[in-house]
């Protein structure tokens, strides 16, 4: 059993934990062996000092070891954001996921209910008629039969129940806000991850490299969006062929018009579901444009498109042919089938 007193004492001095120490500490928390005071002390100690790549890598390895997994194709992708950007935007990554699935790329999407906004991925999918309370086996069937499946985080990470109350009491961001997107239950090796702060763009790409990912974009919009934004440049860290490089992208290079973040303001789950359906039904809007931009990046990650401009063209075809909307209808049917 981990010596929590020693771990907390180490963190209190400003020292960093090794990958193995972090893995053991998080195993203790998620197994229920740590007291709420110990968990709170460790989480805030890490937050105040700043979590390291090794600490995040160790924590993610523990979270992955304890999750309930899903069988998905090796070429499956995930488009996910950390949330916590405070934007209250429409559900960009969820909409983009259907566009990507409509291009023939299997999607294993991981997500949760809203934390900082009115509508998270789980909320809007539920409002669209997709059942989210399904087993891991059922999710795998969705990916196979519908081309897209949604993994509701609480179902796949039952050990999180031991840290949930402490997180609620702390009521501030902790390392756990970063761990969810890095702990996809389908074990995808290809992801586009949006983060709430630019400081995490390069480090999270390094964490995923440490954990064996193959093709990754970690992104943060200049307006604070945890997606690729329409309002200006977006910072990107790309993992490809074992190397990480950082750069910026803009909507201009994808052939899309710019739009202010206010144009992407969302509402509750029902309102966001109506907006998402309108995109999949072909209605032009800034929401369509931002969903296409993020889908394009995911298609680059998947190896389906050579650049954002080609990805946008493929995504537009997915929408306008009805393929993307067809994936939504199929997902609703497969989840309802039990």
Swiss-Prot record:
Mg(2+) 2 binds at residues 226-227. GO terms for molecular function: anthranilate phosphoribosyltransferase activity; magnesium ion binding. 5-phospho-alpha-D-ribose 1-diphosphate binds at residues 81, 84-85, 89, 91-94, 109-117, 121. Anthranilate 1 binds at residues 81, 112. Its EC number is 2.4.2.18. Mg(2+) 1 binds at residues 93, 227. Keywords: Amino-acid biosynthesis, Aromatic amino acid biosynthesis, Glycosyltransferase, Magnesium, Metal-binding, Transferase, Tryptophan biosynthesis. Binds 2 magnesium ions per monomer. Its cofactor is Mg(2+). GO terms for biological process: L-tryptophan biosynthetic process. It catalyses: N-(5-phospho-beta-D-ribosyl)anthranilate + diphosphate = 5-phospho-alpha-D-ribose 1-diphosphate + anthranilate. Pathway: Amino-acid biosynthesis; L-tryptophan biosynthesis; L-tryptophan from chorismate: step 2/5. Catalyzes the transfer of the phosphoribosyl group of 5-phosphorylribose-1-pyrophosphate (PRPP) to anthranilate to yield N-(5'-phosphoribosyl)-anthranilate (PRA). Homodimer. This is Anthranilate phosphoribosyltransferase. The lineage of its organism: Bacteria, Pseudomonadati, Pseudomonadota, Alphaproteobacteria, Hyphomicrobiales. The gene is trpD.
């Amino acid at each position: 059993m981990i010596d929590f007193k020693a771990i907390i004492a180490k963190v209190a001095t400003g020292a960093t934990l090794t990958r193995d120490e972090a893995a053991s500490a998080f195993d203790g928390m998620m197994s229920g062996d740590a007291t709420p005071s110990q968990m709170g002390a460790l989480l805030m100690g890490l937050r105040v000092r700043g979590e390291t790549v090794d600490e995040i890598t160790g924590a993610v390895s523990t979270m992955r070891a304890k999750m309930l997994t899903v069988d998905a194709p090796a070429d499956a992708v995930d488009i996910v954001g950390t949330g916590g950007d405070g934007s209250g935007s429409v559900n960009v990554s969820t909409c983009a996921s259907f566009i990507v699935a409509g291009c023939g790329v299997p999607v294993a999407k991981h997500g949760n209910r809203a934390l900082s906004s009115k509508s998270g991925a789980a909320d809007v999918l539920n409002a669209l008629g997709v059942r989210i309370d399904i087993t891991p086996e059922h999710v795998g069937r969705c990916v196979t039969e519908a081309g897209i499946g949604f993994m509701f985080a609480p179902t796949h990470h039952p050990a999180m129940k031991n840290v949930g109350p402490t997180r609620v009491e702390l009521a501030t961001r902790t390392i756990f806000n970063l761990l969810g997107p890095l702990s996809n239950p389908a074990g995808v090796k290809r992801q586009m991850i949006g983060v709430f702060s630019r400081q995490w763009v390069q480090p999270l790409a390094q964490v995923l490299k440490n954990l064996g990912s193959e093709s990754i974009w970690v992104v943060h919009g200049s307006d604070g969006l945890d997606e690729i934004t329409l309002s200006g440049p977006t910072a990107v860290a790309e993992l490809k062929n074992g190397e990480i490089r950082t750069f910026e992208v803009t909507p201009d290079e994808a052939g899309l018009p710019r739009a202010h973040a206010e144009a992407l303001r969302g509402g509750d789950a029902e309102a966001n579901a109506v907006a998402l359906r309108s995109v999949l039904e072909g209605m032009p809007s800034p929401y369509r444009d931002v969903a296409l931009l993020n889908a394009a990046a995911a298609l680059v990650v998947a190896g389906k498109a050579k650049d954002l401009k080609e990805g946008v063209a493929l995504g537009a075809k997915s929408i306008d042919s009805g393929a993307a909307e067809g994936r939504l209808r199929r997902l609703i049917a497969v989840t309802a089938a039990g």
